[in-house]
């Protein structure tokens, strides 16, 4: 059975490795990215071409995949004059692997449906290294029939593919997960900063906290930076702040409010404003050690 032709937009660390995995598995691809070196690397492997526009990419593709930074970028690529919506084929499926605003995802899905195309939101867990080997965690959502249509491809990209229900549930779940994780990291980083300011040994604090129910991989990441000066949680303050902002917006769309998320976002934003945007989230420890009332 012939494999579907895939259009892939977004060749950052994660996207580039996802594309390499698809190429190794014999898929024909049409790709786009602002980074022409990344595009050239993909094309040099064979079985891939560069599309001149999102419209052209959609016209060539059975499945269109996004691995992009923000909802705003996704909307621009979908709705632009030479955008995906202008070229999408009837029966094609769009998959958004990024972390996007659920209401935006639902709107795009509705507009694609009017063209006879489907949509799956499928945000990712794990790292670019996992992407290269097809071992991602994929949180997929959308119409069940559409999901089953693309599941064979998702299974070649993910070790664990979760089906979460209607369109938007994947992005909702990812935002909840990131809200919980980043709030935990920010709180633990301040705990280690408080210990330093008070003259309490950070290693001893970790030994005590990690022997109880607060222990978690996130605590270890925070301890690695605050105590061992090793920054190994590969997620930037800028990205965390973006996701917290999306979570706050999602809660507003749901008719409620999260003061906890707003407080976490406020600390991340202040660290961002201080020039720490590209630092890994546990490095917010440095911001807390310098914070004055």
Language-model features, listed with the residues they occupy:
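NAD(P)+-binding Rossmann beta1-loop-alpha1 motif at the extreme N-terminus of oxidoreductases
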Residues: 1-59, 63-67, 97
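Rossmann-fold NAD(P) dinucleotide-binding segment
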Residues: 54-66, 70-117
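Rossmann-fold dinucleotide-binding core
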Residues: 99-178
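Active-site-proximal catalytic alpha-helix in oxidoreductases
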Residues: 134-141, 162, 166-198, 207-221, ...
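Interdomain hinge/lid region at the active-site interface
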Residues: 171, 215-281
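Beta-strand segments within the central parallel beta-sheet cores of soluble alpha/beta enzyme folds
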Residues: 203-210, 262-266
């Amino acid at each position: 059975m012939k494999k579907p032709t895939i259009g892939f937009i977004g060749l950052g660390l994660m996207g580039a490795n996802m594309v390499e995995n698809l190429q190794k598995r014999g898929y024909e691809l049409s790709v786009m990215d602002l980074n022409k070196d990344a595009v050239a690397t993909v094309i040099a492997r064979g079985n891939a071409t560069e599309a001149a526009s999102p419209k052209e990419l959609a016209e060539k593709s059975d499945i269109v995949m996004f691995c992009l930074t923000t909802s705003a970028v996704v909307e621009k690529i979908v709705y632009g004059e030479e955008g995906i919506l202008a070229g999408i084929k009837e029966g094609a499926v769009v998959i958004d692997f990024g972390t996007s605003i659920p209401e935006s995802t639902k709107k795009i899905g509705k507009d694609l449906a009017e063209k006879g195309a489907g949509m799956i939101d499928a945000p990712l867990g794990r790292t670019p290294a996992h992407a290269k080997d097809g071992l991602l965690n994929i949180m997929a959502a959308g119409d069940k029939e559409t999901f089953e249509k693309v599941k064979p491809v998702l299974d070649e990209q993910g070790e664990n593919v979760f089906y979460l229900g209607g369109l938007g549930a994947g992005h909702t779940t990812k935002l909840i997960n990131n809200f919980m994780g980043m709030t935990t990291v920010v709180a633990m980083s301040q705990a280690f900063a408080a210990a330093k300011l008070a003259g309490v040994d950070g290693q001893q604090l970790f030994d005590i906290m990690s022997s109880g129910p607060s222990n978690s991989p996130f605590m270890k990441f925070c301890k690695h930076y605050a105590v061992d000066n090793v920054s190994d949680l590969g997620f930037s303050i800028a990205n965390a702040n973006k996701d917290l902002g999306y979570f706050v917006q999602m809660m507003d769309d749901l008719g409620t409010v999260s003061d906890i998320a707003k407080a976490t976002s406020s600390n991340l934003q202040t660290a961002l404003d201080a020039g720490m945007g590209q630092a890994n989230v546990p490095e917010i420890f440095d911001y807390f050690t310098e914070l004055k009332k």
